[in-house]
């Protein structure tokens, strides 16, 4: 710690910070533009000027940039010095000379850091009367709008996009006061993190195009704290609603998880919530709509006297899955996950519980100094983790700078010192990945061969680990280099997962973790699972969807209740058809129209994450609560959407002729927690419904929320009472606490007086860029309890397919491989057409060129797909895009026994 003096006040700060960060952490206001907590300091904008004095006797002082000045012990500075204030006001005035002053029509208005800083400096009069510089805007794709005339040349966009996220297609062109931030030519931004430009940019240059179509100001939206359902990373989000529609998603700061950034799937994939074809009333097979009571009575009538199986879902909350389990009985509850995938997820859970190495949170990943990624294409399967890995490899430059006594926040200096030095990252994958550019070495091979390399690394680390027979010398040498790098590191990290359908990859990663612990290395292990609640569902229990379908086919059950799951995306279509044909009753509770709801005798309209509350467990083992954003019935009483757990508990009560005893979320969450010691801590994931600040509930709406009395005027001039939320500590209103002074971990939207942009998160943190003052949201359910793992000894044989056969492997796509986000119109523009991928050597052997139409026979099906030649894919492999339309879900791992150019 260091003692500094600010305008005569003696204050304690972190001496490792710069003055800007230190003062902001104290709650003092200094305007800034180019600095960002995640990007460090470059001193480009000159906006954060303060007066620095030699000591208490110095009356003259000198102007310094606070972001470039360390907060050394004994520093004397002034923020309120008149010369410093005039300097800051003049900087804003210079920046505004070419700004269009178009706040009333700018989509950033009311959400704009430039507005906040202009007001903060007191600049309120335009003196510039000359021609303004203008630019041509670019079409940057379906996610981002571009308005270059608003640019103040802070350089934040390129520093994030290129330096932080590793993007290559956004740059800065020109010189002096005529610079241009964009692409060489119009075109979709290629980075999977491009959406963060909308929050990183302090002005309205980059704005959310998906929000533009149905735009409203930030102060006119209703928000809630929520969790992204796009993958298993558990990123925190702030969804905003107006008129019963989800309008945009912003990043919600969680210092242990996503911090300031999201991937584009999580930010722009919300459109499925607004789809017109969603079930919003209970529906019979003939299309007849039912009231709530009629639906419950009909469901009970259909199920009475039946042998029921319940099929849950890894995209549904723990509460909803538990309610289904209570309805049908634990022995008749099935997870809704394909058998092989469920086996792998259970293995992940076992390894994480028994591993001698801890599971890192997302932020912690950035602090590891050697990483081995085994089998995962992280940018496509856990994109936010890939972004964290990019920061981990940069730790080498920070170490070099530290040796030269250069502070890590001096971004340009650290880059100059480090040049191209990176911490070692090794990637073993099917083919090239978006992280290959920062990897020390990459190897591309079949899943079994990748696993063999992993087992060999474990054996190289510790000779007691199972050896790999018949490993070629090149692979053995690579395994030794990886082992040496992991041993040389202070904090090595192993990452694997389920995406390639290989248990052996997970087992190899577990062996490496055990070997590292035996070598007394302070490392970590992280394992990726497919969906938002895959790990939570594995903790809850239940057999595979295949077992459920087989029970119906065999006649042991004749009724199926499906929760938020499209069975046709899980397993073989013929098997699903056979089970649904055999079932006398099919009831589906879902928020989407799917092939399964099309077969249902009764559809119960379930709530999406925006309309309901629940708990998810991320791949880290962090239980986190998502909260209802809006009440759809407030604007349309005919909508009968309810959380899955409400429908299923009410149905159970109707069947048993009992009263409903889960009347609020806390009741069902407590029931889930009491059902298993492993889930006992989920009650601590968020405050209960009784939580208050100064006697107030927490406001979902900003204080300036307008138009509430007019929103239903077309229905009735009599304004109804706002919806009452008995489930949570939040109110569907601006009435309630919305400030930043009282600590709270669940923050619907970031706002503080004078701070309307996302930079307002500064006011909620213990120190800027640190953690929330009340603690980061969520609670960990998995902590390392010592080494309880035995060596996994089933090393697979080397991949050697029979002549004329190929193994089907999955290529995952951030846009397209996840079911719900793929229903969002902007995301659909980024989804590739279905294809088949082969190695160049295989294409040459078949005599086909890129783009040729191929016919392949696999698992009794014939597919006709265009060819994409992949130079890095191994021989004997056929890669298909997982999750895309036209690609059967049960095809991966199967053998292709007929592959040829299709007859036109």
From Swiss-Prot:
Residues 221-277 form the 4Fe-4S Mo/W bis-MGD-type domain. GO terms for cellular component: membrane. The keyword Iron-sulfur applies. Binds 1 [2Fe-2S] cluster per subunit. It catalyses: a quinone + NADH + 5 H(+)(in) = a quinol + NAD(+) + 4 H(+)(out). Its EC number is 7.1.1.-. [4Fe-4S] cluster 3 binds at residues 228, 231, 235, 263. [4Fe-4S] cluster 1 binds at residues 99, 103, 106, 112. InterPro entries: 2Fe-2S_ferredoxin-like_sf (IPR036010), 2Fe-2S_ferredoxin-type (IPR001041), Asp_de-COase-like_dom_sf (IPR009010), Mopterin_OxRdtase (IPR006656), Mopterin_OxRdtase_4Fe-4S_dom (IPR006963), NADH_UbQ_OxRdtase_75kDa_su_CS (IPR000283), NADH_UbQ_OxRdtase_ferredoxin (IPR054351), NADH_UbQ_OxRdtase_Gsu (IPR010228). The keyword 4Fe-4S applies. Keywords: 2Fe-2S, 4Fe-4S, Iron, Iron-sulfur, Metal-binding, NAD, Quinone, Translocase, Ubiquinone. [2Fe-2S] cluster binds at residues 34, 45, 48, 67. Residues 83-122 form the 4Fe-4S His(Cys)3-ligated-type domain. GO terms for biological process: ATP synthesis coupled electron transport. Its cofactor is [2Fe-2S] cluster; [4Fe-4S] cluster. Residues 1-83 form the 2Fe-2S ferredoxin-type domain. It comes from the Bacteria. GO terms for molecular function: 2 iron, 2 sulfur cluster binding; 4 iron, 4 sulfur cluster binding; metal ion binding; NADH dehydrogenase (ubiquinone) activity; quinone binding. NDH-1 shuttles electrons from NADH, via FMN and iron-sulfur (Fe-S) centers, to quinones in the respiratory chain. The immediate electron acceptor for the enzyme in this species is believed to be ubiquinone. Couples the redox reaction to proton translocation (for every two electrons transferred, four hydrogen ions are translocated across the cytoplasmic membrane), and thus conserves the redox energy in a proton gradient. Required for plants roots colonization. Composed of 13 different subunits. Subunits NuoCD, E, F, and G constitute the peripheral sector of the complex. Belongs to the complex I 75 kDa subunit family. This is NADH-quinone oxidoreductase subunit G. It comes from Pseudomonas fluorescens.
